[in-house]
Amino acid sequence: MIPYVATRADTPPKPIIVVEKANFDSWLSAQPEMHKGWIAAQGFEATGGKSLSLPGSAGDIDAVLFIKDGAWNIWSLADLPAQLPPGFYTVSADFSEKEATEVATGWSLATYVFDRFKKSKKEFATLILPDAADENMVRRTVKAITLVRDLINLPAGDLGPSGLEAAASQVAGEFEAEQTNIIGEDLLTYHFPMVHAVGRAAADAPRLIDITWGDKSAPKVTLVGKGVCFDTGGLDLKPSSAMLMMKKDMGGAATVLGLAYMIMDAGLPVRLRVLIPAVENSVSGNAFRP
């Protein structure tokens, strides 16, 4: 399932009419008088990326006008999911596979909201997947990026080293990858003293997450991502201005997990290894000294 991108519509979809900026005047001259009048009344200027809902005779939306100026890219239609009323929409355009895949991916990514702790959920417009699009690539990319965004957006109180390990286990388990975790004092036994030193003051023990997947004879690809779930600076205590965004100090770990998901989901012929040192750099009597 791809958020707000569907392969079929439950209700008749509204067309998104793509008009090249250079062709706008000629296109407009061929439109019904009602639409000409509406476009004029709205003071619509045909600049690239702008859109306008065109009314039907019953006062509903008949179609959506979109002005294209330049090549398609992943964010070409990304404003529309939030601008248009919820419902189903199709795009009438001569897409290549790459263009269709990127446009659908950008549409879905534009609907992302971190609302895990909210009761009410925002609704968006749904795009019918263009025929030329690679559905699996859209799904894979959106799921991977959503994973990365969710992990980074989680408050530090809800994602410590053990939580990052659990997220890694979920990704590894989906593709039957092998995972080992070296935790706490075992880091010293296996010669990872700095991972231990940075995280030893936290109640949630430091750990090294190690995931392997794929044919052992395939070309080796190793991804290493920093997993500092929160960074106070230890006893070299950071000021508030430098600490406010430190929940994102594990963004490297989130990114390699998202990339690993894409690699494994695509079945790429590689021997993949993912290494994530996961710690919370906290403050206590045994905190790391600078």
Q: Where are the language model's segments positioned?
A:
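A structural-propensity feature for long, helix-poor, extended segments
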Residues: 276-278, 283-290
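N-terminal hydrophobic/helix-forming segments and targeting peptides
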Residues: 1-229, 242, 262-266, 270
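Short acidic, Gly/Ser-rich segments with clustered Asp/Glu that frequently serve as metal-coordination loops
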Residues: 228-236
